[in-house]
Amino acid sequence: MTLQEQIMKALHVQPVIDPKAEIRKRVDFLKDYVKKTGAKGFVLGISGGQDSTLAGRLAQLAVEEIRNEGGNATFIAVRLPYKVQKDEDDAQLALQFIQADQSVAFDIASTVDAFSNQYENLLGESLTDFNKGNVKARIRMVTQYAIGGQNSLLVIGTDHAAEAVTGFFTKFGDGGADLLPLTGLTKRQGRALLQELGADERLYLKMPTADLLDEKPGQADETELGITYDQLDDYLEGKAVPTDVAEKIEKRYTVSEHKRQVPASMFDDWWK
């Protein structure tokens, strides 16, 4: 088995999918898991990007089906901007599409800035822009877990195969969640699910960005990665890609393995 095939298997990627069937499987997963845990629903941060829009709509469909079947479940969508978000219109469009039971807005700027200032005062140096970006991601997850804890809700994560293969997420930030309904999907497969669900094309054709850096606001994921999502998707779907691209992907996969594992102990062997 080639490394490419091993990665596809490890990340549960199918080269060809039926969007309608995938929607059904993922809604059923959300329903089954929330019932098993005894939780009362879900909470998810909504950025206006493809991934949170898709995960949010799946979550809302799941809780509506649970209620229609006589159960009790709710979904809270959370806007988590740092000051003013330049693509706020897209975030609002996503909320309109998702139709969450409840939506709230929580500006993380005061919390992040207070922490950054305290860090500088105590340690005598400023956080790097990259490190501060990770703080933003972790504060967002702290907020979601606070809302989830208050309301007995599970926190949904938006990780999918194209992020997982590169480790392109913040450990214990957007990478920290209770369940991942997009696991195994490539970026283009996620777009196909949103198309099937009737989303406005603005929500899945826009340039993907983590938008965590103050010094490079709105920087494209592909710029930061040095790899395009089409290249990642082709690789993950078993297609041939240029050798240098495959090497970049495989290197990122190898060095980011720790991000796809629970905290290491001396009894684990994945890191050896």
From Swiss-Prot:
Q: What is its EC number?
A: 6.3.1.5
Q: Which GO terms describe its molecular function?
A: ATP binding; glutaminase activity; metal ion binding; NAD+ synthase (glutamine-hydrolyzing) activity; NAD+ synthase activity
Q: Name one GO cellular component term.
A: cytoplasm
Pathway(s) it belongs to: Cofactor biosynthesis; NAD(+) biosynthesis; NAD(+) from deamido-NAD(+) (ammonia route): step 1/1
- The UniProt annotation places Mg(2+) binding at D51, E163
Positions annotated to bind deamido-NAD(+): R138, K171, D178, H258, K259
Q: Which residues bind ATP?
A: G45, I46, S47, G48, G49, Q50, D51, S52, T158, K187, T209
Q: Which domain of life is it from?
A: Bacteria
Q: Tell me the subunit arrangement.
A: Homodimer.
| Family the entry assigns | Belongs to the NAD synthetase family.
Provide the protein name: NH(3)-dependent NAD(+) synthetase
Protein source organism: Bacillus cereus (strain ATCC 10987 / NRS 248)
Q: What is the lineage of its organism?
A: Bacteria, Bacillati, Bacillota, Bacilli, Bacillales
Gene that this sequence comes from: nadE
